């Protein structure tokens, strides 16, 4: 898949790849441990205690040209439903309602990017759930 980068609506794969790498790093930092804390919490605690910033806190930068897609994804994700077994994936109906309520105009390529981010997020949630089950025995 490709995405816009560099202020042009010509699609370039590098920009979406940068967003993907940024998102993977953020999702990994936000992964919850069985005690309810996140990986980010643990690393920031190390930083506070030692005065040294763990390199794992510093990941790829958010690509400026498509930062809005990341913000939109987070906005949609914060309102996602739950089916009793875990979080629901975002869907077109969720996005259509969000666009209508916020007045946001989203291009088809941006919708694809949001759905790609959601697949990554759901995958990270599945890993966290599996780790929690394994920790419980």
Short names for language-model regions:
Residues 1-137:
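An amphipathic, hydrophobic-aromatic interaction surface with interspersed Lys/Arg
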């Amino acid at each position: 898949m490709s995405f816009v980068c560099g202020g042009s609506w010509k699609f370039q794969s590098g920009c979406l790849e940068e967003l993907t790498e940024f998102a993977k790093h953020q999702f990994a930092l936000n992964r919850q441990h069985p005690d309810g804390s996140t990986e980010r919490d643990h690393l920031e605690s190390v930083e506070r205690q030692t005065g040294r910033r763990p390199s794992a806190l510093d990941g790829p930068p958010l690509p400026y040209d498509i930062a809005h897609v990341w913000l939109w994804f987070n906005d949609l994700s914060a309102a996602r439903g739950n089916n009793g077994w875990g979080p629901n994936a975002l869907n077109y109906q969720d996005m259509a309602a969000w666009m209508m309520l916020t007045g946001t105009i989203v291009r088809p390529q941006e919708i694809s990017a949001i759905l790609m981010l959601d697949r990554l997020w759901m995958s990270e949630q599945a890993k966290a759930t599996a780790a929690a089950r394994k920790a419980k025995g």
